[in-house]
UniProtKB/Swiss-Prot annotation:
HAMAP family: Nuclease_YqgF. Pfam families: RuvX. This is Putative pre-16S rRNA nuclease. One of its GO terms (molecular function) is nuclease activity. Its EC number is 3.1.-.-. It comes from Yersinia enterocolitica serotype O:8 / biotype 1B (strain NCTC 13174 / 8081). InterPro entries: RNaseH-like_sf (IPR012337), YqgF (IPR005227), YqgF/RNaseH-like_dom (IPR006641), YqgF/RNaseH-like_dom_sf (IPR037027).
Amino acid sequence: MANRTIVAFDFGTKSIGVAIGQEVTGTARALTSFKAQDGTPDWQKVEKLLKEWQPDLVVVGLPLNMDGTEQPLTARARRFANRLHGRFGVQIALQDERLSTVEARANLFDSGGYRALDKGSVDAASAVIILESWFDEQAG
C-alpha cells in the first residue's frame, strides 16, 4: 500500500466538508468545512488548503440516490471535482457517499449530543466517512 496523503471533500451547495488521511494507515480525520455559494467554494481557501497539505489524491463524495442512480447534485459534485482537477492539477477519485451525512450526524450526536451537530462539523465528519469508505474499497 502506498504512503499517499489524501484529501476528501463532502460537496454541498451551502457547505463543503474536508478531511485528510494517510493511505498507509487507512485513517482519516476532519479538517474543516467551507461555506459555498450555490456549490461554489471560496477557491482561494481551497487553494490554500491544497498547498498546505499537498495531497497525492483528492477524493470527492458522489451523492447518489439509494438505488445508485444519479440525482441533480451528482452532476454538480462531478463538476466540482473537474474544477479541482482543472484549477489545481490534482488527481481525483469519486466515491459513493450514500448515507455518509446520516452516519456522521449519528457519530457526532453519540460523542457530543445536539451541541456537536453544527453544520460545519457534520460536513467535515461526512468527508471523513467518505475517505474511510474509499480506504476500505482500496483494501479490498
